[in-house]
């Protein structure tokens, strides 16, 4: 077993039935609370697509109102040493940006939270999809390293080395 990814899926009917009681902002805050609890459980190496909630009723997703909750969540995740995912499949979602978006990614960098890039590759053609853009987003946020896992041990690679590896695979 190389890597255990923990994700909260707020779009699933079971999750919505249990946690959405009419107050969308409270539902969003609960989602971030669950991300922190997942990291604190110690079960996961990485927390996946950490702002996926923005795709549920995106017109009601107000980052400025949620930033305090998000920062508290990131503080808790950082304290565990758990990595977080930059998920490139967000480019194909209702809110067409990676998960997390740029501001949350910058906040992760400020807390020195390691990042793994993922593509939610449910189809073979999506494997490593948009990883080049993901590496660029990491650079823009101030990261110089990207992480992956082998035998559940995190390995940090320079972004330039990861980029070179991607380019060599495209030949």
Question: What residue ranges belong to the model's regions?
Answer:
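Extended substrate/RNA-proximal surfaces in nucleic-acid metabolism proteins
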Residues: 1-80, 162-171
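Charged catalytic cores and adjacent phosphate/nucleic-acid-binding surfaces used
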Residues: 61-171
